[in-house]
């Protein structure tokens, strides 16, 4: 605050150093969760960028996106959406429909729609982006694969699993082929497909993929990595959902032991692991063991 105030007083409000200091102060407010103060500054930054550089300048576009993102983080989605829509219109008009900034702007607007529960509008934009990435970059480009995964996730969120699953399946095949079976993106893609299978009741198929992921995480990362713990917990939950408690409980027990050893008994993640195991005990009729974990008499 002192840096911004000093530069504004000595150099003037429109000096590049003053504008940079204001940017830094706004970002500091944003990182601290002081969204109202961040928004006030970012609105001023946008107004100045439009006045000094012009409404169609890259500086104005960047300032508009920063303000929209802050509105979004603050939960003021209607205001965020209005800015994202304006930015998409302006970028498409000035740079063209095929420009990377247009696709990025469309993605941001779609994400805000999704956050607001306007899934049909989000899906429409995600579909358009996937078509554009496939046409411009090719089906195997990382941006195309990421775009397909995003669209699949939106379908899943909307309950349109019959449309989500083929996209997740295609992505897993393509990522494994282009990046290799041991690549983190392959494991993430397999996890997404397994989750979609689980959500649609195809538990045996989900479990097979979750089992494969856990094996790979242990082999590639080791038994004590957070991703390994998460993978084990996910598999255990799938076993429990399928009524296979004899297989779920040992995994929950191992996870609680490992979380307690690596994070400590009072860590929130350890407490979640304890709760998961207690619920599995309860489902298996092992009430006394569940009570001990729940801390009830």
Residues covered by each model-derived region:
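Intrinsic-disorder-linked linear interaction elements in eukaryotic regulatory proteins
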Residues: 1-297
């Amino acid at each position: 605050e002192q840096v911004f105030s000093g530069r504004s007083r000595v150099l003037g409000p429109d000096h590049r150093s003053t504008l940079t200091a204001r940017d830094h102060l706004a970002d500091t407010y944003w990182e601290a969760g002081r969204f109202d103060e961040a928004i006030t500054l970012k609105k001023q930054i946008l107004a100045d960028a439009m006045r000094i550089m012009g409404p169609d300048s890259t500086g104005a576009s960047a300032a508009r996106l920063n303000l929209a993102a802050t509105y979004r983080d603050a939960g003021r989605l209607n205001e965020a959406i209005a800015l994202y829509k304006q930015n998409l219109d302006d970028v498409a008009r000035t740079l063209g429909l095929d420009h990377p900034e247009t696709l990025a702007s469309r993605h941001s607007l779609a994400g805000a729609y999704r956050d607001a529960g306007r899934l049909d509008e989000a899906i429409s934009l995600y579909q358009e982006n996937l078509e554009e990435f496939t046409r411009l970059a090719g089906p195997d480009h990382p941006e195309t694969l990421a775009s397909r995964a995003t669209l699949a996730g939106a379908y899943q969120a909307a309950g349109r699993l019959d449309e989500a699953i083929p996209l997740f399946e295609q992505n897993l095949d393509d990522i494994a082929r282009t990046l290799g079976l041991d690549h983190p993106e392959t494991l993430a893609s397999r996890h997404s497909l397994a989750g979609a299978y689980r959500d649609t009741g195809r538990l045996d198929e989900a479990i097979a993929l979750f089992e494969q992921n856990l094996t790979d995480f242990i082999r590639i990362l080791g038994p004590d990595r957070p991703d390994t713990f998460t993978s084990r917990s996910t598999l255990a939950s799938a076993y429990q959902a399928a009524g296979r408690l004899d297989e779920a409980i040992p995994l929950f027990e191992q996870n609680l032991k490992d979380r307690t050893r690596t994070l400590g008994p009072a860590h929130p993640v350890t407490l979640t692991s304890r709760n998961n195991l207690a619920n599995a005990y309860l489902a298996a009729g092992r009430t006394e063991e569940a009570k001990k974990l729940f801390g009830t008499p």
